[in-house]
Amino acid sequence: MSRVTLSRYLIEQTRSNNTPADLRFLIEVVARACKEISHHVSKGALGGVLGSMGTENVQGEVQKKLDVISNDILLEANEWGGHLAGMASEEMDNAYQIPGKYPKGAYLLVFDPLDGSSNIDVNVSVGTIFSVLRCPNQYLSQNESLNEEAFLQPGTEQVAAGYAIYGPQTMLILTLGNGVKGFTLDRELGSFVLTHENIQVPATTAEFAINMSNQRHWEAPVQRYVGELLAGETGPLKKNYNMRWIASMVADVHRILTRGGLFMYPRDAREPSKPGKLRLMYEANPMSFIIEQAGGASTNGYDRILDIKPESLHQRVSVILGSKEEVERVTAYHKE
């Protein structure tokens, strides 16, 4: 039986589910960019790509060399194809305008070019997260300048989302709104090949992922829930739990997607003005879309992540996602 490549899968989606051809081409271009990023990541010290740039991004985070390299790869791969009206990235203050010499398309691409990049120097899995939105009609004119407002759409408006994880294997996880598929990079073929047909998050779990060093800063509902997890079979939940924390959202969510679990990055008291650490547009929204399409759930403790109307491009949000029953439990604690 012949293997199904990403290209074949997308063509079949165009035939059977009316996936627009432009969206198909866009996903293929993003996948090619991820292959190039994977190549740079795998070189490590041999490629001279480790270490920091000595600069900061809009979030005030130190930029790693690979952050900037990955960002440039995604921009250069996608700007000329005619599928996009604009792009936005964790590494850029403002929306990226498609140069006037290239045709504009109907979609917007939002991405975190290298999530978990603080782990690069210690050889821990990192990844690229992306989200695709339709561009509002008023910005589709070739001469119309794109601004931040075009991107400020709730996660329910995403037409596709995915991430590439650069680990022992390079994988691409993708949803077009009809389930979640996993593709593994076959380096001999140079193609992503379908290896995970219908990914589902188990409804219950015995694992959770959270940075326990921040426990003293959490709000009471999170303190209560994690306390119950730690109490194990002698506590109210009557079973033992294991904690896993990689400090790379892609790596933590990928584990939860494949074997169940709960990922939490809650609001804490150190910066009361900030509702969370993770960015809504290019981290929480695409990951929440993927998790929901796999049968899981995602909230900020009170509301469904995908229903939140963004107010700014780099807006932060608290995130609780994963196995549905556990997400519903901790969300209920917030509402008591």
Curated annotation (Swiss-Prot):
Subunit structure: Homotetramer.
GO biological process, any: sucrose biosynthetic process
HAMAP family: FBPase_class1
Subcellular location, record wording: Cytoplasm
Amino-acid positions noted as binding Mg(2+) 1 in the UniProt annotation, renumbered to this chain: E90, D112, L114
Major subcellular location class: cytoplasm
Family, as annotated: Belongs to the FBPase class 1 family.
Cofactor remark from the record: Binds 2 magnesium ions per subunit.
Cofactor field: Mg(2+)
Protein name as annotated: Fructose-1,6-bisphosphatase class 1
Binding site for Mg(2+) 2: D112, D115, E283
Top-rank EC class of the record's enzyme: hydrolase
Pathway the protein contributes to: Carbohydrate biosynthesis; gluconeogenesis
EC number(s) per entry: 3.1.3.11
Gene coding for it: fbp
